[in-house]
Amino acid sequence: MKIHEYQAKQLFQKYGVPIPRGKAAFTVEEAKAVGAELGTFPVVVKAQIHAGGRGKGGGVKLAKSAAEVDQYAKGILGMTLVTHQTGPEGRLVKKLLVEEGLPIEKELYLSVLPDRGTSKIVFMASEAGGMDIEEVAAKTPEKIIKVFIDPLLGFKGFHANELAYGLNLKPELIKQFNAMVAALYKLCTDYDCSLVEINPLVLTSDNRVIALDGKINFDDNAMYRHKDIQEYRDLDEEDPFEIEASKFELNYIKMPGGNIGNMVNGAGLAMATMDIIQQAGAAPANFLDVGGGASAEQVENGFRIILADPAVKGVLINIFGGILRCDRLANGVVEAAKKVGIRVPVVIRMEGTNVEQGREILAKSGLNLINAKDVADAAQKIAAVAKG
């Protein structure tokens, strides 16, 4: 689960991580009121969406007067902000964060997250702050410092010192920095975070260490433990198809720009199916893993969700029947087709448990379905019919 920057900063403040003075605003009038309350200029007007790259997309502006706060708030609120993370469709901006400007001397990068490879918590830091950390890691990996923490032993002072010295901090800043790092570790572990990121973490000319930006992602599987965090969820920032799929415990991810819907059982098979669709000259419109033990109802709802996407020009169903028997899949597809109708070509490749019963159910259904002998054949057929 993702949250907005202003919500992340509320958690930072709760844990004693220094942040700029500021407040969220949901209207132009509220933005102007926050600017007036801050009392000094410049102030920063920032779009609040669940995506990075807001500055390059025109979603972050430095206002040097009350008139500019009004101008920028009017320009950003209600805009469709397109960044490298939103896809070409962009995101509608419904919230702003208005903050004080700071006398920045240096920008750093700092994050903490679980590392699956080592089963430890890792801090990542870099003097290349304010940049895309993936780009830094790819081009200049030597600029990234990593400090691993065994959760059994917990965070110790020497971990913070290792980061501070690696970032070449001035001695007078180390105490502030170390306190911040300890707080971020506690925040990450208390709330089952999958990522806590500050980019940039700024050093000011008056010797302060401040989280200028904030990003926190949470482990969805742990949200039952954190009812307070669930209240931060913004459904407007989530894909409506993904929200609908989650109601039926389906693993669905929308793929921008795709035209072939697909339903598969098993994450590995789903990813391989998406690759084969791409190789056949089409583009997958979604990732949908119905799971090994899906019911006919889940199959029905998965199929319905795929067909509800107007971008979908064809559907590929690729099932290897094990726990999910082929006859159960067939019944789910038939029920979904009866309820919502089939407006696009559908190619089905089935193998495994009760495959003959499944094929018989589909054959007797009267539905215009295209059978495929294997995955490659299925991908070629759906790509061909989708192209018309």
From Swiss-Prot:
Pathway given in the UniProt record: Carbohydrate metabolism; tricarboxylic acid cycle; succinate from succinyl-CoA (ligase route): step 1/1
Coiled coil: none
A single GO BP: succinyl-CoA metabolic process
Domain ATP-grasp: 9-244
Disulfide bonds: none
EC category: ligase
Keyword Aminoacyl-tRNA synthetase assigned: no
Residues that bind ATP: K46, G53, R54, G55, E99, L102, E107
Binding locations of substrate: N265, G322, I323, L324
Keyword Cell inner membrane: no
Protein EC: 6.2.1.5
Cofactors demanded by this protein: Mg(2+)
Comment on bound cofactor: Binds 1 Mg(2+) ion per subunit.
UniProt xrefs under InterPro entries: ATP-grasp, ATP-grasp_succ-CoA_synth-type, ATP_grasp_subdomain_1, Succ-CoA_synthase_bsu_CS, SUCC_ACL_C, Succ_CoA_ligase-like_bsu, Succinyl-CoA_synth-like
Residues holding Mg(2+): N199, D213
Reaction(s) catalysed by this chain's protein: succinate + ATP + CoA = succinyl-CoA + ADP + phosphate; GTP + succinate + CoA = succinyl-CoA + GDP + phosphate
Alphabetical UniProt keywords: ATP-binding, Ligase, Magnesium, Metal-binding, Nucleotide-binding, Tricarboxylic acid cycle
Protein family (similarity comment): Belongs to the succinate/malate CoA ligase beta subunit family.
NCBIfam families: PRK00696.1, sucCoAbeta
Main function: Succinyl-CoA synthetase functions in the citric acid cycle (TCA), coupling the hydrolysis of succinyl-CoA to the synthesis of either ATP or GTP and thus represents the only step of substrate-level phosphorylation in the TCA. The beta subunit provides nucleotide specificity of the enzyme and binds the substrate succinate, while the binding sites for coenzyme A and phosphate are found in the alpha subunit.
Subunit structure: Heterotetramer of two alpha and two beta subunits.
Protein name (database record): Succinate--CoA ligase [ADP-forming] subunit beta
Organism from which the protein derives: Syntrophobacter fumaroxidans (strain DSM 10017 / MPOB)
